[in-house]
Design a protein with these regions (language model features):
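Walker A (P-loop) ATP-phosphate-binding motif of ABC ATPase nucleotide-binding domains
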Residues: 3
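Walker A/P-loop
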Residues: 15
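The conserved Walker
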Residues: 10
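NTP-dependent small-molecule kinase module
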Residues: 125-168
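Conserved nucleotide-sensing/catalytic segment adjacent to the nucleotide-binding pocket
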Residues: 28-82
Length: 168
């Protein structure tokens, strides 16, 4: 495990999981939201995002946290492992609501109730819009180890096993 992608629906716990992976493995984390979004909530183009992302991907070791389907193929070209957090929709919505008005280091602003409503709408449509494409794309890279995590408990269990493996 040297170059890790953590993907999944908003609110699935990607950032939490990525930070825990960093604690265990010592790998640096790149948050896609910090690359894509500006402090004023405007975003850059996906071409610009790919250009900003590429130097990180060329590094020997990393954890990249975030979805951004339009950049997934590029990220998969470099990844050794993918953690796909397939949490139940209700848990994802809960995760979104829990971070309202909370300072975070993975996004350049504090999310408001309005932001949460937009993310919840996106989350409700996630499976129909994105999930199948992501699963199909992952199959194009048989050498990448894909770890499917379907619950918060499953995530915690995996992280505990990894701690033992890394003697932490």
């Amino acid at each position: 495990m040297k170059r890790i992608l953590v993907i999944g629906c908003p609110g699935a716990g990607k950032t939490y999981f990525s930070k825990k992976l960093k604690e265990i493995t010592g790998l640096p984390v790149v948050h896609m939201d910090n690359l894509y979004w500006n402090e004023d909530k405007t975003s850059i183009s996906f071409d610009e995002l790919n250009k900003k992302l590429l130097p990180y991907l060329k590094e020997e070791e990393w954890i990249v946290d975030g979805n951004y389907h339009d950049t997934l193929k590029l990220r998969l070209e470099y990844a050794t492992d993918v953690f796909f957090l397939k949490m139940p929709r209700e848990q994802c919505i809960e995760g979104i609501l829990e971070r309202i008005d909370q300072p975070r280091d993975d996004i350049p602003w504090i999310e408001t109730k309005k932001d949460a409503v937009e993310l919840i709408e996106w989350t409700i449509d996630y499976e129909a819009r994105t999930k199948a494409d992501e699963e199909a794309l992952l199959k194009e890279y048989p050498d990448i180890k894909v770890h499917i995590i379907k619950s918060r408990k499953g995530a915690d269990t995996y992280l505990e096993k990894l701690k033992k493996r890394f003697h932490r």
